[in-house]
Amino acid sequence: MQFSFVSLLAALGFFATVRGDLHQLIVGTFGTESLYTLEFDDAALTLDLIGNSTASAASSWIALSHDKKNLYGTSYSTAPAFVSYTLGNATDILYNSTLDIGGNCSSAKAIFVTAATEPPYAVYGTLFGGTSAGCGSVYSVDENGALSELIQNYTYKSTSGVHGVALDSTNSFIYSADDSANTLWTHKVDNTTGELTLVGSVSGPVTGADPRHLTVHPEGQYLYVVLEGANELAQYSIDQSTGIPYFENVTYPLIPSNATSADYWSDEVALSFSNNYIWATSRARSTNNTGYISAFSVASNGKIVSQLFLEPTTSSGGAANASVFRSVAPSEFSDKYVALTDSATGFVEIWSLASNGSAASVVAHVDIDDGGCCANAVVRFDSTPLYLFYESTG
């Protein structure tokens, strides 16, 4: 989920001109067959709902193709499958296809999808829940980027439930966060077919750590993992010869030190536009508590330098059930903005990083209380700059 920030202030006598851009986000849902389009104005700091497109299925996670011309989603409310759409303008979302996952995991739900940024632009999906979620799938795409064929169905282990995956910047390796089996998996990517070969796996740092989501620094030396059960962000180093991550006992809290860990479950992690910061979130299991959002400074090689802050969010982020989710994603052209989605009450917020990085605060908010929103969001469109005029005294 990403935003750009470009602003220009010019004195024109008693008036000033602000040059801002409009950015459109697409937001998925858990329980309604809709894809919402939002528009963020980075000058006026407003966030508006501008489109509601009928979807073929609710999508708990959506991802863009490398060129942003296609959207891929989980088919969350049906038998495990993945869907694809062609994207036109900001609100023109055209359904293409639905492909089942195959294998022996029919009782689970499709939970996560991501797309390669290098040829052959394969799409990867994983499952969660049910009695058998230890399957993953690889899909080819056609010349237009739509899902074409299931080309590989692979397995983790019988107790697995992989809630998130991440490709490295060269698309050489894909890492899987196995929440149910407390394991991190490493697969090698075939750069001709996109198919995967298992390289190895490592257990979570402690029993009940439960890795949920993860991301890889572009330099390829470090992997960042949200530990849902431990409510921590863990930094892993990556073996440069094998690609396998190894834990060096570096973790940071995603809840306050006086909080009861059992009352929370941590969720999301993402790098900022410049890769100088990491954003991460936690959720409360009760609406009586808030969740938290945190940011970290990062060295040029990817090593975490320090935790900058831990701020309470405006809601719990969700109660303890499978249909609750919180997503955080950074902007594409600035470290300043991050989008936070919330399904506990159904909203999307834009948070702004303080100029010195010491805090963050909400600058825009939109409610979408449809009983299923909001899952994650992606940024598809950047429009022509918008010029706003306001009275100036200096």
Language model features with spans:
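Short loop/turn segments immediately following the C-termini of beta-strands
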Residues: F30, S75-T78, T126-T131, V141, ...
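Short loop/turn segments immediately following beta-strands, especially the blade-tip
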Residues: T37-L45, S84-I93, V138-L147, H187-E195, ...
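Loop-centered beta-sheet repeat module
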Residues: F173-A234
